[in-house]
Amino acid sequence: MSNYEKTQQLPIYQKAELLFQLVESLAASLPEDNELLQSIKEIMRADAMMLPAKIAGAEAGNIYSIRMQNAAIIRFHAMSIYTQVGGLRMYDDTIDKKFIQHIRTEIENFRLLFINWVQSFDTSNYIWDEWELFNPKGAIPPTDVDSFDFDDYMDESN
């Protein structure tokens, strides 16, 4: 089984795919004659597309700091969908509020899967994040002793 096939079996990936399908269904139901709704539709679609893509990106490697960067992006886009979908509630006559609540419930389910998924990341396999945002707890920054000096590996007879 390929790494991508394994990723597709993850509950968080499957939930991300479901959210994409739900957003697509909601977007298809929005009236075409409202510019604001069309803008919201495009934002929601873009956000929903990012979820499975970034999960696959995080699963493609095992470096903690890179996985956390992807996780932060996933969180941002999931929260954006939640906000955009919630904003649609003000369109009483055109939007099915039960469907909106269903999507928001699925985002909450996604959030719970997300928490478990992030907790599964290997914190011992990291590259130091100079911005110090994605370093695992207790990570020690590199020192000058840790740096690479090309001259250390050159034969002095040359």
PLM feature spans:
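Amphipathic alpha-helical assembly/interaction segments
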Residues: M1-N158
